[in-house]
Amino acid sequence: MPDIVNRKVEHVEIAAFENVDGLSSSTFLNDVILVHQGFPGISFSEINTKTKFFRKEISVPIMVTGMTGGRNELGRINKIIAEVTEKFGIPMGVGSQRVAIEKAEARESFAIVRKVAPTIPIIANLGMPQLVKGYGLKEFQDAIQMIEADAIAVHLNPAQEVFQPEGEPEYQIYALEKLRDISKELSVPIIVKESGNGISMETAKLLYSYGIKNFDTSGQGGTNWIAIEMIRDIRRGNWKAESAKNFLNWGVPTAASIMEVRYSVPDSFLVGSGGIRSGLDAAKAIALGADIAGMALPVLKSAIEGKESLEQFFRKIIFELKAAMMLTGSKDVNALKKTSIVILGKLKEWAEYRGINLSTYDKVRKRE
């Protein structure tokens, strides 16, 4: 087995310090316009950003999606993120826990999260390929118990695996059969998330047919994991690097993925993530059809700078979200989900080509 721990460190180093954010790709969120209301009918002070994350109430409709863990220095990053998200009442996901299941010394870098964040929702994380490789109920329960998780994310990352030097692109259909059986035995919900390339309506429908109702888009336009693996390939002189260059804009853009999942699985719980870089992006994702927005890379970068930097980042994000709510007359998150929007440009073209009737979709996104 390759050294997963060193790979985790290299992933964080490349993500934080190389140019991989939105490289050669777009979220399409620029094509979502929130309609300004000159007389909002509310005051800024009465805006309520609280919402539900499964069984728990959260302060803001934003979560930190999983990214890291596995070594002491990564545990320190997780600790900072956990302390700050606890302070702000924001859910936190951890990175893949495979390393902690297979290497006991890696467990503390994940377990620290619950120790410093006793009340917020914490989301465990395992990869779909591990189901093919033999993971089952025992490993899922271990990942959940390790951090006393409120949910577990199962990540899809076929594009990353294809271009990873030591990748394991194993996605046989029986993995979904195993996942369906495991979900029936777990005490917490499963969220299926992508890893920077988005969830299409075909994938959403397939997952739904196996009992999955919770999704995290992780769409194109944010952290480019193909680019991260391309850089790792280049460092190793791996011939895959040249091929990876041709796939840097591969995937379903975040805004399109939100629409595709909401349209095809209207009753889903949906996290809109992938290139969410501001509170305005978060507001657009929610107005477009997500229940909450998710972000990882900007949180990671701020956490590396320190606790104060991350606190300031969240204050900025929350202010921008509330500003968007104020200027659309949305006094709470449910109102934001129903606020008037205009869909333009490439996103409109994408939706129309994919058979999404915009008038019908407007009712679907408002949950009417």
UniProtKB/Swiss-Prot annotation:
GO cellular component, one term: cytoplasm
Catalysis performed (reactions): isopentenyl diphosphate = dimethylallyl diphosphate
Enzyme superclass (EC): isomerase
CDD domains on file: IDI-2_FMN (cd02811)
Residues at which substrate binds: 7-8, 96-98, 160
Location(s) in or outside the cell: Cytoplasm
E.C. numbers: 5.3.3.2
GO BP field: isoprenoid biosynthetic process
Binding of Mg(2+), residues: 161
Major subcellular location class: cytoplasm
Oligomeric form and interacting partners: Homooctamer. Dimer of tetramers.
Family of this protein: Belongs to the IPP isomerase type 2 family.
Protein name: Isopentenyl-diphosphate delta-isomerase
Organism: Saccharolobus islandicus (strain M.16.27) (Sulfolobus islandicus)
Gene expressing this chain: fni
